Amino acid sequence: MKVRASIKRICKDCKIIKRHGVNRVICINFKHKQRQG
């Protein structure tokens, strides 16, 4: 999980979702997991 000020999709499988007011990137590649904070 990477915590970044600005999150971006790294590949076509990445999805940006909002969970409890926090933007997250979920992907089949676990290295692409990100959280905005």
From Swiss-Prot:
Name its species.
Answer: Mycoplasma sp
- Write the protein's name: Large ribosomal subunit protein bL36
Which SUPFAM superfamilies does this chain map to? Ribosomal protein L36 (SSF57840)
Q: Which HAMAP family match?
A: Ribosomal_bL36
Q: Which NCBIfam families match?
A: rpmJ_bact (TIGR01022)
UniProt entry tagged with the keyword Aminoacyl-tRNA synthetase: no
Q: InterPro entries from the entry?
A: Ribosomal_bL36, Ribosomal_bL36_sp
Taxonomic lineage is: Bacteria, Bacillati, Mycoplasmatota, Mollicutes, Mycoplasmataceae
PANTHER family annotated for this entry?
A: 50S RIBOSOMAL PROTEIN L36, CHLOROPLASTIC, LARGE RIBOSOMAL SUBUNIT PROTEIN BL36C
Please give the family membership noted in the entry. Answer: Belongs to the bacterial ribosomal protein bL36 family.
Identify the gene encoding this protein.
rpmJ
Q: Which GO terms describe its biological process?
A: translation
The molecular function GO annotations come to: structural constituent of ribosome
Q: Which PROSITE patterns match?
A: RIBOSOMAL_L36 (PS00828)
Q: Tell me the domain of life.
A: Bacteria
UniProt GO cellular component terms: cytoplasm; ribonucleoprotein complex; ribosome
